[in-house]
Curated annotation (Swiss-Prot):
Lanthionine-containing peptide antibiotic (lantibiotic). Active on Gram-positive bacteria. It comes from the Bacteria. The keyword Cell cycle does not apply. The keyword Oxidoreductase does not apply. This is Lantibiotic carnocin-UI49. It comes from Carnobacterium sp. (strain UI49). GO terms for molecular function: signaling receptor binding.
Amino acid sequence: GSEIQPR
């Protein structure tokens, strides 16, 4: 799946 990457 996709991982959340907070920028």
